[in-house]
């Protein structure tokens, strides 16, 4: 049995995306049955091939909200899922804005591409869906896209949480209490808070408010002003008592029975 997370970058926000000083390819979650790509921003398909991860084996796509650092390679991932649009295959999960569009937010995967998938589903916070050998539950956010979602994925070896882009709101405490691994989109360091996003101090408050803290926090979606992620990870760890590591291109985290391990793949 396997449960693993592989990062195709760690950057987020307009400046990090434009400069590509931190890659913005999102991340993958692989289990025995699931091969899910989460938030494939610019360069996702390039990073997959660089790391020699087969895009063709992908069978699920999750896009959290309608900002380009999360969705731009989505249609290419769909083309991989569907074997070059030749087979009706795979699952696409996303927020209302992502899948159907709403107001100024247009859907980000074309109806043509959506038509080639076996299942397309809109998720709202609190919604759950069976996803191969896992269960996914959408979580709350407060961000520019009012329909944005994160998720909590239940696997054979415990739960993985993903905040997506959000500022600190009380609902996050319940959403992620008890997950084994939490992937938190932390754009800025210390108390340098900006609207719609978490800073390091927000992550500390979130972790310390939980009844059962995660075993591991992974810092993701870091902006250009997050100049020394390792020092920031140590700061968060010192103030929460849990292990904290920054994501980076090629980081692979394996969730095992009663433990976890991580390494860098190239």
UniProtKB/Swiss-Prot annotation:
User: InterPro entries recorded for this chain?
Assistant: Metallo-B-lactamas (IPR001279), RibonucZ/Hydroxyglut_hydro (IPR036866)
Q: Which residues cross the membrane?
A: none
Stated name of the protein: Uncharacterized protein MJ1374
């Amino acid at each position: 049995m396997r449960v693993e997370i592989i990062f195709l970058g760690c950057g987020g926000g307009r400046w990090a995306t434009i400069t590509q000083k931190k890659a913005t390819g999102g991340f993958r979650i692989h289990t025995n049955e699931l091969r899910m790509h989460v938030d494939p921003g610019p360069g996702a398909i390039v990073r997959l091939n660089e790391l020699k991860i087969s895009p063709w084996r992908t069978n699920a796509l999750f896009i959290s909200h309608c900002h380009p650092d999360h969705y731009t390679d989505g249609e290419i991932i769909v083309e991989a899922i569907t074997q070059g649009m030749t087979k009706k295959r795979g699952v696409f999960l996303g927020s209302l804005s992502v899948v159907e569009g709403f107001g100024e937010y247009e859907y980000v995967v074309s109806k043509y591409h959506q038509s080639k998938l076996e299942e397309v589903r809109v998720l709202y916070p609190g919604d759950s869906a069976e996803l191969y050998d896992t269960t996914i539950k959408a979580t709350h956010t407060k961000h520019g896209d009012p329909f944005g979602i994160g998720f909590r994925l239940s696997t054979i070896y415990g739960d993985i949480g993903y905040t997506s882009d959000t500022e600190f709101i009380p609902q996050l405490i319940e959403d992620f209490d008890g997950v084994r691994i939490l992937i938190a989109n932390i754009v800025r360091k210390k108390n340098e808070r900006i609207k719609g996003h978490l800073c390091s101090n927000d992550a500390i408050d979130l972790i310390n408010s939980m009844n059962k803290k995660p075993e591991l926090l992974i810092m993701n979606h870091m902006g250009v002003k997050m100049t020394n992620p390792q020092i920031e990870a140590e700061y968060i760890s010192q103030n929460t008592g849990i292990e904290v590591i920054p994501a980076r291109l090629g980081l692979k985290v394996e969730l095992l029975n009663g433990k976890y391990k991580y390494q860098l793949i190239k």
